[in-house]
Amino acid sequence: MKAFPETFLWGGATAANQVEGAWQEDGKGISTSDLQPHGVMGKMEPRILGKENIKDVAIDFYHRYPEDIALFAEMGFTCLRISIAWARIFPQGDEVEPNEAGLAFYDRLFDEMAQAGIKPISANLRVEPSEECDASV
């Protein structure tokens, strides 16, 4: 049986809207993905956390990523494909400057991955434009 080459990337993938939670923290804008579980497109209404709002918290990767990255490293991951929440970087979709808190989160995440020996593979999440940006199209 042939062995995988040393350079083969073992890993997994996540989607920001499915794992991050923290939908309304550190300046993140409301994305179309935040609205979809509620069956309507439009302005976000205040909500009570419940099973129907599970994506609001998801696995709370935004706050618990160090623990998750450590588990991925323990599992032997050498890469992790993540998506970047557009509404966390450009909350309204038309800003000239990015949201520094959003950039800082991804900086910390990438640093944690590097320390664990996990190569980041990133993509913008295609279903994550800000609600304001999506509504203007």
Stretches with model-predicted labels:
Residues G11, R64, F105:
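Charged catalytic carboxylate motif
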Residues E67-V137:
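Substrate-binding cleft and catalytic face of glycoside hydrolase catalytic domains
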Residues M1-W10, A15-A16, A58:
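Mature N-terminal, pre-catalytic/accessory segment of carbohydrate-active enzymes
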Residues T14-G39:
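Short, solvent-exposed beta-strand-terminating loops
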Residues E6, G21, E25, D56, ...:
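Generic structural "secondary-structure junction" signal
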Residues I30-A70:
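Aromatic- and Gly/Pro-rich amphipathic surface segment
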